[in-house]
A protein has these predicted regions:
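Glycine- and acidic-residue-biased ligand/ion/polar-headgroup-sensing regions
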Residues: 83-104
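A short, N-terminal "cap"/entry segment at the start of jelly-roll beta-barrel domains
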Residues: 1-65, 112, 155-157
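Short acidic-glycine-tyrosine-enriched beta hairpin
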Residues: 102-125
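Double-stranded beta-helix
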Residues: 103-106, 127, 131-157
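Conserved short histidine dyad/triad with adjacent acidic residue
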Residues: 67-85
Length: 157
C-alpha cells in the first residue's frame, strides 16, 4: 500500500514520463483541448486490403498506432522486421503461428502458437511472420507505423 501512496504523490508530468517509459514512448502527450479530442475522434478508420486479409487502422499518430488485423485461415504475412517500430499483438479471435527471430532466416526462426487471449511482444529489429491456423482477428498495438520501415525478407500472401 505504501507504493500506491507514493505513486499518488507524484506529479502528473512525472507519472506521464514514467508510464511512457514503461511502454516505450518516452512520454505521453495528453489531449489538451476538446479540439484535440475531436481531431482524434473524427479521423476515419483506414481500411488496407492485404493478400492475407486486411488491416483496419484505428489510429496512427506520432505517439502510437493501433490496428485490427484479419488474417484468413491458411494465409500468412511476409517474414519482415522494422528498425523503428515496436509491436504487441493480441489475439482477439482465432489462432496463429508466430515465427520470430533476430536472424534473417525463416527456416531457423522460433515459432509460438497464439490463441484467443494470448499476446506477444515483437521488439524493434525482431523478424516475424504470422500464419493463421483459422480465421483470426489480431490487435496490433505499436509505435507509429511508417511504410518505409517495413523490411520484407520473404514474401507473404
Amino acid at each position: 500500500m505504501e507504493e500506491i501512496g507514493e505513486i499518488m504523490k507524484e506529479s502528473e508530468e512525472s507519472l506521464r514520463q514514467r508510464l511512457g517509459s514503461l511502454i516505450g514512448l518516452g512520454g505521453i502527450r495528453p489531449v489538451k483541448s476538446s479540439g484535440d479530442a475531436r481531431m482524434f475522434a473524427s479521423d476515419p478508420i483506414k481500411f488496407v486490403p492485404k493478400g492475407w486479409g486486411y488491416e483496419k487502422w484505428i489510429a496512427n499518430c506520432p505517439e502510437y498506432c493501433g490496428k485490427l488485423l484479419f488474417i484468413a485461415k491458411g494465409r500468412k504475412c511476409s517474414f519482415h522486421y522494422h528498425e523503428l517500430k515496436d509491436e504487441v499483438f493480441y489475439v482477439q479471435k482465432g489462432a496463429i503461428e508466430m515465427y520470430y527471430s533476430f536472424q534473417n532466416n525463416l527456416e531457423t526462426a522460433d515459432m509460438k502458437i497464439l490463441v484467443e487471449g494470448d499476446k506477444m511482444h515483437i521488439p524493434t529489429g525482431m523478424r516475424h511472420q504470422f500464419v493463421a491456423l483459422k480465421d483470426t482477428e489480431l490487435f496490433e498495438f505499436s509505435t507509429t507505423h511508417f511504410e518505409e520501415d517495413s523490411y520484407r525478407l520473404e514474401k507473404g500472401d
